[in-house]
Each structure stands twice: as C-alpha cells, then as structure tokens.
Amino acid sequence: FGNSGAEVNEAAVKLARRWGRRMRGGAHEVISFDGAFHGRTLAMMSASGKPGWDSLFAPMPQGFAKARYNDIGSVERAITADTVAVMIEWVQGEAGVNPADPGFVRELRALTTERRVLLIADEVQTGIGRCGHAFAYERFGIEPDLMTLAKGIGGGVPLAALLCKEPFNGFEPGDQGGTFGGNPLMAAVGLAVVETVCTAEFLASVRRRADQLARGLQAIVRDHGLVAERGAGLLRALVLPGDTAVQVVEAARELTPTGLLLNAPRPNLLRLMPALTIDEDDVEQALSLLRLALRAGQRAT
C-alpha cells in the first residue's frame, strides 16, 4: 500500500525491474505511451508522455521508452531485449480522456505474453467503479500482470495500492514501503469503499448513470455544434470546436445558485468525473448547467 498514484506506479516499475533482473537477464526498460500520465515523481514524469516533461526537471531518470497509443505496431517496434514491461492507462485522462481500443488491448496482451514482457495497468483514475466495472481491464476480457490503484480506492483519503500476480511478486521485506502506507485508518476507509462500490448492484447503477450522461452529452454535441463526446463509464469528455475550455470551466464555476465542477486538461476539451453515487436527477441538473456554461463560455470569447 501507498499514499498516492505516483508512489505505487513507481513501485510497479521497481517490481517489474526486480522481476526482469531475476527472470529476464537484467531487462529493465519500461514502454509507456505518448500522452500518458503516471505521476509527478521524477521517474513517473519520465514514464509519462506529457509534452515538456522530459526537460522540465532535467536530467531525468532513464529506462523509459515511448510508443503510440492504440498502435500495436508502434509497441512491437519499441520492444527490445531490455524491455521488461509495458505500462498503460485504459483511458488516458490527462491526454483528453482517450479510451484504449478493445482490439488494441487484446493485441497488446497477446504481444506482451508472447515476448515475456509484463503488462502494468495504471488504474489510478479508471479503477474502483469509475468505468462501470470494479476495474477497467474487465471491459476488455484480459488481465494485466501488475495493477495500480489510488484516487477512488481511498474515497477521499490518501490511499493507493499495487497489486500483482504471484509469479511476479519479487519484493523482499524492505524493498518497498512508506511511513503511512496502508495505515489502519486509511485501510479501514479503503475496505469500506471496496465493499460498497465493488458490488453488482452498485456497479450496475454506475453503468446506468454513465449511459444517461453519455446520451445527454451526445445531445449537447448536436445542439451546440461541438466536435465529439467520448469516454468510459463516468469518466467522460466533450471536445470543443475551439480553445474555449478554460472559459467554460470558469463560467460553470460561477453559475448561481449552484456551480458545476469541470476540468480542462486540454484547451479544447472538458473532462467530467461525477461522483459514482450521482443519481438520475443530478445527472439531468448537471447537463442543464453544462448547457448554460457552454453558452456563457462562448459569450466570454
């Protein structure tokens, strides 16, 4: 256990490299993807594919290669004898809520298995019900070798976790840990979250609200002349025709008597991540407020 997504993502890389040293003759390089976001530690900034991060705090840790998202040929070309793992988000949140193509994911799982390369799933943003399943990998009918969780698993408190299949568990006592990781208070919260969210009834409700939200966003795209709506479960985005996302976010925050929290990871994109407990009426209210914010944002430009 850890406290943040970056912490457990870095632990996943450590574990993969430990396995590579023991089982793959010292293989250590990790392939990640253009547009990826894995955290703000130096190593995870190297693993991320966010523009400019390779020089912001240079020199950066080495041992990370990049491939193109949803391009299996790019991954295949990036694999070398030194490759120990591929690290992927099933939905790239910071890059603009870009979901992985199911066919690509299945090909990636087959390729990594064939080449004896570990598949690390960064489910910090997508896990614990966010995409309508306990874990987003369930949408693809595959399983990763290592998986990281944070954000949702803590229900608002700092809790994160690294999970792995037993054959890849090469950590020895003292290899990984932290002062507050897995402390009793946070663990109790995490257990309550998992026992509540990871039930068939709760997840079915998430999928119903996700379908409702997606339909509403598609109507907004048509009515407001936007570019597209996309996402998975209750992690969704609106693509705008111009770089007006910041203005829309500000307009949404200032709506009265109730504001609307939006996020703009890209100048032309709005990200929506409502609470998993959102009900039908709240979805409709949010969609109505979003329409108002879009009009106000357009007027501001």
Where are these regions (language model features)?
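Conserved N-terminal phosphate-binding loop of PLP-dependent enzymes in the Aspartate aminotransferase
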Residues: 1-301
